[in-house]
Regions:
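Active-site scaffold of zinc-dependent metalloenzymes
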Residues: 2-51, 66-67, 71-85, 89
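Active-site recognition of the HExxH zinc-binding catalytic motif
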Residues: 54-66
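Short, Lys/Arg-rich amphipathic alpha-helical interaction segments
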Residues: 94-98
Length: 98
């Protein structure tokens, strides 16, 4: 998968694959995180291709909620997880490229 930039609501987010990804605030190893101030999405590059795509979709949901001003929900995993899972399934089951 090669996506270097993605436009989310008019904001261009850079997408980076990184080894041994550590989330800056929690200092924990994560599969992905979004830096809203830098408009950047980081994804662990040791994941399988499928998990990289799923993680990208998950982080896109975070960024989409952020960019729409959904301050109460952009970081709520109870909202982001099901939306991300469903969006990935729709794309995958309909053979839409990610």
């Amino acid at each position: 998968m090669t996506i270097n930039k993605i436009n989310i609501g008019g904001v261009k987010y850079a997408v980076y694959l990184k080894k041994n990804l550590i989330e800056p605030d929690s200092h924990q190893h994560v599969w992905g995180y979004t830096d809203y101030e830098k408009s950047a999405i980081y994804i662990e590059n040791k994941l399988s291709e499928q998990h990289i795509k799923q993680t990208l979709i998950h982080e896109l949901v975070h960024a989409m909620l952020w960019e729409t001003g959904a301050v109460d929900s952009y970081n709520d995993e109870k909202i982001v997880n099901p939306l991300g899972n469903m969006l990935y399934a729709v794309l995958h089951l309909n053979n839409l490229k990610i």
